[in-house]
Amino acid sequence: QRQANAVLGGTSIGRPYTSGTFSINGDDTIVATIGSDKKPADLARVQPDESPLFLTDLNNDLLGSKTLASTQRVTWPSSHDGKLIEGWVMRPPEFDPASTYPLILEIHGGPHTAYGPNFSTEAQLYAAAGYVVLYANPRGSTSYGEAFANSIDLAYPGYDYDDLMAGVDALLEEGYINKEQLFVTGGSGGGVLTAWIVGKTDRFKAAAVAKPVINWASFVLTADLNYYFATTWFDTAPWEDIQSYWDRSPLSLVGNVSTPTLLLTGELDYRTPISETEQYYQALKHRGVDT
């Protein structure tokens, strides 16, 4: 069958990452993984000026009887410099614009990756539970050109915080978000930004920080790609300029945190070692923050 409003991707079914693969034969016919915000990828044949012709239908037996949420593309200017930021809003399936809803800000990892209008098990579950979900591509994300991706060079985390907070503010202006019920979460690079956010503002009722970097100095000496991080994300080694590492570490802001914070990391995570999470957990406990 043919399907409009489909996008390349859909191979990352947990969160709405832009992922996918394709193959081209000699007559310029493309076979690709094509999905949508309501369905993970199927194989489809793609030809110019035609909707994709799907060759598989892998999940209809499961999802065909479900009421799923749709996404809406939104944009807003960053509060830092007016740079246009793209995001998507997912509302509960039975959304009523006259009601108010809690909001979850969900932040992608990387940071050099991107979200899109793709299927997301997590976002669908949040929406089914009655939450509005906002996810976005702040500066540093891929898909918007090299300059946009590299705008966080030696400055991460930083103004990406302003990009995301401006998105929350823009959604609040729509009138259907309960400003007392704001939540934030993210994993890896999203965990970095979630921990950074609760150190900068107390506007969120609770946070879930997954597999974060909390202390850049300890991270570059324990992570699996330690040499890469120390030589490309910073100008010098931590013992040569410890202040540059500290200034960008969420741990430097832990004295400001009052938001109840859940921490999640795998014990065998070599990219964002469990020792990062343990530092943050102990620091929050020392301060009496619910964690």
Language-model features: locations:
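Multi-bladed beta-propeller domains
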Residues: Q1-G20, V46-S78
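Residue-level detector of Asp-centered blade-edge/turn motifs that repeat once per structural unit
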Residues: N25-G26
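Residue position within the beta-strands of beta-propeller blades
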Residues: I30-T33
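Short glycine/acidic-enriched loop and turn motifs that connect beta-strands
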Residues: S36-K39
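A short loop-to-beta-strand structural motif that recurs across blades of beta-propeller domains
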Residues: D42-A44
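Cap/lid segment of the alpha/beta-hydrolase catalytic domain
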Residues: E50, L58-E180, G187, I214, ...
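Active-site-proximal cap/loop segments of hydrolase catalytic domains
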Residues: E122, Y135-T291
